[in-house]
């Protein structure tokens, strides 16, 4: 295998060594599926992204995303992190928008100046709403009591490309106490082939609107520090059920505190006609560069 360049970036971070870690491997066209999976397992981040070519196809760059255990059709923080690498190291800073060709389809990423930094925004597919779950099933899965759940809102599967079960809880204390019962979790998560996102309107920091934790054991990720795909699903859920009193959503979500990777995810949702548009944004920091030999 010819030496391949890779970058480490921190996504949804406010500074280096926070947020969600990502490895981005360049010029990966000649890597087999098995080799990509082996590299992702070696990196052992939540996901590793592979830029198949530095040439555009149909206006976008072909990208594949792997967790330590399998390939996924879409994931949020790899989308933003890979777009950052493409903009700075392939387009050399000249692109105002980068389009990724993922298994789920084309995902555009735009760049917004924020002082001497930039916020990356991705527009996700319109959310689809699936199965509604019984409270007692998630209480067993998360080892919580039924009184911890906010019964004003449903526990529901939502997907913008990767499904998540959205679970509303009343308090930050309940979010912190949640502990996955692995066998129950796998039984529940397999019903949607995705993860579980729990949230509360109580937060660690007063400037933030929600606190979130995400569990994705099904893909070899016990707890994810920052989840763009899951928070996109959450945005759709908040809009549909008017959690903030309106279907328009424009909020700050904190995640990752329980795994010592504090993260900030910016979340927007708005209905235009019959289409619910969802955007997720955050900052990206370059941490390291290296070579695979």
Regions flagged by a language model, labelled:
Residues 1-74, 80-293:
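Active-site proximal loop and beta-alpha junction motif in alpha/beta enzyme cores
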